[in-house]
Amino acid sequence: MWTIPTYILAAFAEIGGCFAFWAWLRLDKSPLWLVPGMASLGLFAWALTRIDADFAGRAYAAYGGIYILASLIWMWAVEGTRPDRWDTIGAAICVVGAMVIIFGPRST
């Protein structure tokens, strides 16, 4: 099953792409940061279309929980700020919700 790895790929591609814009606009980095940023956002959009889901909305809803966890990992690994207990509790709640959406039984 490639669902979880694909969500993880999508999350880090989106975060990386958005961070390129953040770096340009908030950290005074070169506009050249936008080139890999836009490519990363393209990878993000492509990855979400690879999710095994019948409906885009369901794929996006489940992705939200994975994205939140990945964002906190990014904050810790790239920005050097460790998530606090409220970040951790909130992310855990969201990931549980995402897992219910991803793995919940569906009537066919």
UniProtKB/Swiss-Prot annotation:
The chain crosses the membrane at residues 4-24, 31-51, 59-79, 85-105. InterPro entries: UPF0060. It is a multi-pass membrane protein. Keywords: Cell inner membrane, Cell membrane, Membrane, Transmembrane, Transmembrane helix. The keyword ATP-binding does not apply. One of its GO terms (cellular component) is plasma membrane. Its main location: membrane. It is found in: Cell inner membrane. Coiled coil: none annotated. Belongs to the UPF0060 family. This is UPF0060 membrane protein amb3269. It comes from Paramagnetospirillum magneticum (strain ATCC 700264 / AMB-1).
